[in-house]
UniProtKB/Swiss-Prot annotation:
<dbReference type="InterPro" id="IPR001238">
    <property type="entry name" value="DNA-binding_RecF"/>
</dbReference>
<dbReference type="InterPro" id="IPR027417">
    <property type="entry name" value="P-loop_NTPase"/>
</dbReference>
<protein>
    <recommendedName>
        <fullName>DNA replication and repair protein RecF</fullName>
    </recommendedName>
</protein>
<keyword id="KW-0547">Nucleotide-binding</keyword>
<dbReference type="InterPro" id="IPR042174">
    <property type="entry name" value="RecF_2"/>
</dbReference>
<keyword id="KW-0963">Cytoplasm</keyword>
<keyword id="KW-0067">ATP-binding</keyword>
<dbReference type="GO" id="GO:0005524">
    <property type="term" value="F:ATP binding"/>
</dbReference>
<keyword id="KW-0227">DNA damage</keyword>
<dbReference type="GO" id="GO:0000731">
    <property type="term" value="P:DNA synthesis involved in DNA repair"/>
</dbReference>
<keyword id="KW-0234">DNA repair</keyword>
<dbReference type="GO" id="GO:0005737">
    <property type="term" value="C:cytoplasm"/>
</dbReference>
<keyword id="KW-0742">SOS response</keyword>
<keyword id="KW-0235">DNA replication</keyword>
<dbReference type="GO" id="GO:0006302">
    <property type="term" value="P:double-strand break repair"/>
</dbReference>
<dbReference type="InterPro" id="IPR018078">
    <property type="entry name" value="DNA-binding_RecF_CS"/>
</dbReference>
<dbReference type="InterPro" id="IPR003395">
    <property type="entry name" value="RecF/RecN/SMC_N"/>
</dbReference>
Length: 360
């Protein structure tokens, strides 16, 4: 999978650009604030329907414009798609088009464009709350298990309804029919997560040994309640407690994917540089797992490539990315920061105040 062409209009400080990319490496070079991260953000938005920097739509749309528009041409093997996304300032409405047809969902775009992003802020995958690590697992399942997205959506809808009902009823029999359905979905989603975590864990640990040979990294999945406990029974037993607190305490919404080094949480013992390498290892292992299992290449977006990595580690990451045969977008302040990442075929773009030009 690769983005062959991207048109961006009125996205942050980018008024209008029309760019053609290499199917391998694409370098975005410019000073801080020039717009290189904004281009990565536009690429991410096209593949996720949201920003990785802000949840406020008005901050993404260029200050004096009613909307932003993204158009892309995507290629995979012998297939090609045109995709488009427009976000309105006034009502926040999102329009998604695939091959010129309306009525598509953001999830349709996400399926077409499997993306991994590595940013300085991405350490929340390791030192943030469990929700970041659930999202990591669920990204993989979205691309590996065709029924996961619908089951996940139904699960969250039922949890929301149950939490609302907890504040309105004193009789558990009113909740029991919902809880039976909730328990079924919880077991299915948790089993998918457990199976995926089990399949991915050896690849993560192997990649960690390459990037961080001085450390012994182990991963483990926790489903959100005791492993051998029946979830339907647990919901019944916890009704009074859940009602007192106002929400469902246990369940797949509390799942976690934990990382430890020598028996201790990695966020407590690793330096920021080591955490960044571990984050890179996780993203790479997940992208490579997708390729191995589904024969689909992931697109990698890397912001501030040189940050907190020495030259040896930069070269190691660059070589692993080259070996993946994936499309890669990398930002840097200067070309010198990219000298470890110079494949024979690549494209370099200079970014200045929202203007982007390819360097020959």
């Amino acid at each position: 999978m690769a983005i062959a062409r991207l048109i961006v209009e009125n996205f942050r400080n980018i008024s209008a650009v029309d760019l053609e990319f290499d199917h391998g490496f694409n370098f975005l070079v410019g000073n801080n604030g020039s717009g290189k991260t904004s281009l990565l953000e536009a690429l991410f938005y096209l593949g996720h329907g949201r920003s990785f920097k802000s949840s406020v739509t008005t901050r993404v749309i260029r200050y004096d414009q009613p909307h932003f528009t993204l158009h892309g041409r995507i290629r995979e093997l012998q297939h090609e798609w045109s995709v488009g996304l427009q976000k309105q300032r006034k009502d926040g409405n999102t329009i998604v088009k695939i091959n010129g047809e309306d009525g598509n969902k953001i999830s349709d775009l996400a399926h077409l464009l499997p993306m991994q992003i590595i940013t300085p802020e991405g350490l929340t995958l390791l030192n943030g709350g469990p929700s970041y690590r659930r999202a990591f697992l669920d990204w993989g399942l979205f691309h590996h298990q065709p029924n996961f997205h619908s089951a996940w959506s139904a699960l969250h809808r039922l949890l929301k309804q149950r939490n609302a009902a907890l504040n309105q009823t004193y009789d558990y029999n009113m909740l029991k029919p919902w809880d039976m359905e909730l328990a079924k979905l919880a077991h299915q989603v948790s089993q998918w997560r457990a199976d995926y975590a089990e399949a991915l864990s050896p690849e993560i640990e192997q990649t960690c040994r390459l990037f961080l040979p001085e450390l012994d990294i182990h991963v483990s999945f926790h489903q959100g309640w005791e492993k051998d406990t029946d979830y339907a029974q647990l919901l019944t037993e916890n009704f009074e407690r859940d009602k007192a607190i106002g929400y469902t305490v246990s369940g797949p919404q509390k799942a976690d994917f934990r990382f430890k080094s020598n028996g201790l949480p990695v966020e407590d013992v690793l330096s920021r540089g080591q955490l960044k390498l571990l984050m890179c290892a996780l993203r790479l292992a997940q992208g490579e797992h997708l390729m191995a299992q589904k024969n689909r290449h992931c697109i990698f977006l890397i912001d501030d490539f040189a940050s907190e990595l020495d030259e040896t580690k930069r070269a190691l990451l660059a070589q692993r990315l080259q070996n993946s045969n994936s499309q890669v977008f990398v930002t840097a302040i200067s070309p010198e920061q990219l000298k470890q990442m110079q494949p024979e075929k690549h494209r370099t773009f200079q970014v200045v105040n929202g203007q982007i030009e390819q360097l020959l």
